[in-house]
Amino acid sequence: MTDVKKNENMTFEEAMKKLEEIVEKLEEGNVPLEEAIAFFQEGMKLSKLCHDKLQHVEKQLEYMLREDGELVPFSPEEE
């Protein structure tokens, strides 16, 4: 199974955990350049996966609200 297929089957939480691990490794700063590039590429794929999963959930929530006759567009609160 390729890394892409593995990533597609990950849950949001698994992808976030793996992304956090990659960030920690890169922040340590003692990773060889080639390995750092590979980590960065994997991190970008995981970031996109998480973003796509969040967008999917957002659309599901908007659809559920529409079924109840009320549509409130998703708008994240600013912290």
Curated annotation (Swiss-Prot):
Keyword terms of this UniProt record: Cytoplasm, Exonuclease, Hydrolase, Nuclease
Subcellular localization, as worded in the UniProt entry: Cytoplasm
Gene Ontology molecular function: exodeoxyribonuclease VII activity
EC category name: hydrolase
Keyword Hydrolase attached: yes
Source taxon at top rank: Bacteria
Pfam families: Exonuc_VII_S
A GO-annotated cellular component: exodeoxyribonuclease VII complex
InterPro entries, per the entry: Exonuc_VII_S, Exonuc_VII_ssu_sf
Catalyzed chemical reaction(s): Exonucleolytic cleavage in either 5'- to 3'- or 3'- to 5'-direction to yield nucleoside 5'-phosphates
EC number: 3.1.11.6
Signal peptide: none
Keyword match Metal-binding: no
Known role: Bidirectionally degrades single-stranded DNA into large acid-insoluble oligonucleotides, which are then degraded further into small acid-soluble oligonucleotides.
Family: Belongs to the XseB family.
Subunit: Heterooligomer composed of large and small subunits.
Protein name: Exodeoxyribonuclease 7 small subunit
Naturally occurring in which organism (per UniProt): Geobacillus kaustophilus (strain HTA426)
